């Protein structure tokens, strides 16, 4: 890899970790490997982006309003905060998504930074051509972020040691990884294989 790479951390928030409103099994297990990637990318002077679900209290995304999911990651709540052990340390640009009351937003590319700039534009402004993606959940927001990244012309690497899935149906995560590969994403099995 070269200076055109960036790390994209997807939705490592309290509500997606054990004890959260929409917990992913072993969701907190992505934190330690992601912290290693954060240190590696920051040490190399490369960009880091962290997406987050940032829902209003009332949204058609939630079951109570006709959606699929229990209420989760409501902006301003502890459930919407990043996992306390994730060491972003002010080094990441925060990208918020799912802010509309009447729409689902799974992809990080649906999100914007504090100034309203979308992830694709942020990446392009930084000269990024390759994104390395990890986080939660493999079969929803990670998958959609990876697929959107490919559609937008980015090279994409999935950090397999740093993703976990919901698996509402058995095998959803495995099928999602297959879909990402079919779309042209590369898989990095473990941190030690990363070359910057």
Question: Where on the chain are the PLM-derived regions?
Answer:
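Active-site rim beta-loop-alpha module in soluble metabolic enzymes
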Residues: 96-112, 130, 145
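Glycine-rich anion-binding loop/nest that anchors nucleotide
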Residues: 128-144, 158-160
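Active-site acidic carboxylates
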Residues: 1-100, 120, 125, 129, ...
